[in-house]
Amino acid sequence: MEYQYPLDYDWSNEEMITVVKFYEAIERANEKGIVKEELMDLYRKFKQIVPSKAEEKKIDKEFQEVSGYSIYRTIQKGKDTEEHKIVKM
C-alpha cells in the first residue's frame, strides 16, 4: 500500500527503520499473518522507542487512519495467540 507512516522526525534513522519494520509487521498480521514471536519482538523494540502509552495511542490512531489497521487490536491478538503460532487478523 502507498501511504505515509506516522513518524517522529526527532527519532534517529535507526529508530525510524525499527518503527517502519514494526508497522510492516502489523500490516502482515492483518494481510497474511505473522509468527507471534516475530510480531512481539518488533513490538518490544517499538516500545523502547515509544515508551509512553499516550504517544502509542496517538501513533495507533494516525496509523489506523492511513492504513485501516489497529496496532492495539493486532497486539492484543498477538498476546492471545499461542507460542509459535501465526497471528492473523
From Swiss-Prot:
<dbReference type="Pfam" id="PF05256">
    <property type="entry name" value="UPF0223"/>
</dbReference>
<comment type="similarity">
    <text>Belongs to the UPF0223 family.</text>
</comment>
<dbReference type="InterPro" id="IPR023324">
    <property type="entry name" value="BH2638-like_sf"/>
</dbReference>
<dbReference type="InterPro" id="IPR007920">
    <property type="entry name" value="UPF0223"/>
</dbReference>
<protein>
    <recommendedName>
        <fullName>UPF0223 protein Bcer98_2663</fullName>
    </recommendedName>
</protein>
